[in-house]
Amino acid sequence: DKNKAEILNSRTETTKALGEAILKCKNPPELWINSGTATIYRHSEDRPMTEKEGEIGTGFSVNVAKEWEKSLFSFQLAKTRQVALRIAIVLGKNGGAMVPFIKLVKFGLGGKQGNGNQMFSWIHLEDVFGMVLFLQSNKELEGVFNCSAPNPVDNKTLMKTLRQVMKIKIGLPSPAWLLKIGAVIIKTEAELILKSRWVVPERILEAGYKFKFPNIDEAFNEILGKSKSN
């Protein structure tokens, strides 16, 4: 419970502090972009979640996400646009989510996780930067935006694509029961792997943003320094 309180407060209290600071500014910033999470949506294998028609989920991580956004939009700021980015899993070089995926594939464990049908919503780090700059330039945009690539994939496709890019043929699957045991051992949540996050960035696409890395194979090739001719 203490850890959960710390996780929640680390997000809501810092957001409130930023809001209070902006209220005191004589020349407030034109734009306040606050981080959020695509985990706010429910487990979805039946349809994609858009900003307009996505269904909010339940559970601790979802409650954190909701309170985080609530903290941002609780401030009425006449001169500052407020944007909440519901960020999917960020893929980039030098760490982050790529590290465990690469290790699994290298050790021959890069098969599907669980039944492999759960959707994986992701975004390349460069497109996170790209979205931020786009939002800064397009001054009519505000509110909630899904920060995710337009082409999410299921877990089977995710792992198969990574194996192909890394040129490793064997990838043993990890059943759900094994993932749950492993999660307990390393004190994390199996939900991180087994939850189906099917999120699409409808609003930013409608506004005209062009993704640099719309497809997972392109993202993996860039991150791992490989070209399609290799």
Range-by-range predicted roles:
Residues 37, 70-93:
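Conserved beta-loop-beta element that borders a ligand/cofactor-binding pocket
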Residues 56-61, 88-95, 115-125:
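Glycine-rich "substrate-gating" loop/helix at the edge of Rossmann-like oxidoreductase active sites
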Residues 102-110, 118-153:
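Alpha-helical substrate-binding/gating segment
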Residues 135-187, 221-230:
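Mid/C-terminal beta-alpha module of Rossmann-like enzyme folds, strongest
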Residues 191-230:
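C-terminal amphipathic/interface module of NAD(P)-dependent oxidoreductases
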